[in-house]
Amino acid sequence: MRFVIVTGLSGAGKTQAIRSLEDLGFFCVDNLPPTLIPKFAEACYQTEGKIKKIALVIDIRGGKFFDDLFESLKYLKEEGYKYEILFLDASDEVLIKRFKESRRKHPLSPDGRILNGISMERNRLREVKDRADNIINTSELATRELREAINEIYGEHDQIENQLIITVLSFGFKHGIPLDSDLVFDVRFLPNPYYIKELKQYSGKDKKVSDYVMSFDVTNKFVNRLENMLDFLIPNYFKEGKRQLIISIGCTGGRHRSVAIANAIYEGLKSKGHKVNIDHRDINEDIHKGGKKL
């Protein structure tokens, strides 16, 4: 089991660090009182391998509880529980700028100067910083660069390379655009199998409907251009730290055209080695509701 304790200065990026660890498959807990670390560790180690990666954020917000951290770490060591400490640091100038931009008060100086709070916090965290296995100074790091630094230390390289999970989702506009869509494409300009008597009762998953939709030059031009666009977008989304991408393709009812196109895009992405899922949200919606136009 990999057990990471994330700590550091307020404003240095602990929140972003824990999000990055969560993206890497860590079970994450924010602001756990240090006195609870031993019991939490025991519970996790008793899961018989179900939980393999854990990250805890421990910081000065714990107040007097933070002083119990070293006793808890001593207990972990004595009991044979392996752990790592990640310490997030930044310069005074950068921390002051971040606090002013966010209009937040420093936890150790809520009614005073930010610099005084930073100084007090540095003093209290000096020992834990000295014990840290990894220290990341975020003064010059953008969010993406911090994420990359976290990935470099804690990620599994094959996991990092394939971490963008893509979902291709077909839907019907009359049932509403999926709220979690990242990209939405309207294919209602394509010829509609609904008006072909022998195809109406089938869906875009059926070969006869798919063959009909894909038989038109306009369809193939659209699919080719969409695939080229995705070839450009996907690596750039990943570069900026995106880890999930939902591509929604809609027609009127979500049963014929959108399903056929979604399947074509899914197969194309899959053939290129992407981690991709397919979902046809409304494929049976009009059957259940007795709707007409698809």
From Swiss-Prot:
**Which keywords belong to this entry?**
ATP-binding, GTP-binding, Nucleotide-binding
* Residue positions binding GTP: D59, I60, R61, G62
Top-level taxon of the source organism: Bacteria
Q: Which Pfam families match?
A: PapZ_C (PF22740), RapZ-like_N (PF03668)
UniProt-annotated binding residues for ATP: G8, L9, S10, G11, A12, G13, K14, T15
Q: Does the keyword Nucleotide-binding apply?
A: yes
A single Gene Ontology MF term assigned here is: ATP binding
* Matches recorded under PANTHER family: RNASE ADAPTER PROTEIN RAPZ (PTHR30448:SF0)
The text of the family note is:
Belongs to the RapZ-like family.
In its UniProt entry, what is this protein called? Nucleotide-binding protein CBO3377/CLC_3320
Q: Which organism is it from?
A: Clostridium botulinum (strain Hall / ATCC 3502 / NCTC 13319 / Type A)
